[in-house]
């Protein structure tokens, strides 16, 4: 099995959490600041802004305030119950702190999205190699077990002397078959039989 030098690989993964807030006449602003020690790497992915079921028939405008008020507010949704009660927002990533404000209307307006935290995991290539080696060892063990379970059938071999005697016997039987000559139909004809039998000579009388 091949060995490789140890080296570290940093992988960046994202951990997402649901986020939501409400804007109404009593609470016209809300600020997202992130949570925990990872708030510096946090992003807010806004998804939907919608009116509540108790919203009045009036225009409700939601805007985002810039940090420290350096830039003018940006309107992200203008809602009305009978016309547009909900909007779907996509592709907006906001870095905390982010402040939302209900500029006009009494709401209630609900905002929802995802808190996205980036985390760095330090993984080692050796750990992956060890896992691969363990898998290969398991496969080898399974193959050995399967070979042990297969029954081995023993084949009986005939002794050389016995083989020679059998071959000799077959040869003798073949020679005997060749020596036996069967009479042909011509040998059975009466003419040939009479010709083959010699006639008796008549005695000659001396004068």
Curated annotation (Swiss-Prot):
Residues 198-207 have a biased composition (Basic residues). SUPFAM superfamilies: Nucleoplasmin-like core domain. Ovary specific. One of its GO terms (molecular function) is enzyme binding. The record marks 57, 84 as: Interaction between pentamers. Residues 123-147 have a biased composition (Acidic residues). Residues 1-15 have a biased composition (Polar residues). Homopentamer, when bound to H2A-H2B dimers only. Homodecamer of two stacked pentamers, when bound to H2A-H2B dimers and H3-H4 tetramers simultaneously. Belongs to the nucleoplasmin family. This is Nucleoplasmin-2. It comes from Mus musculus. The lineage of its organism: Eukaryota, Metazoa, Chordata, Craniata, Vertebrata.
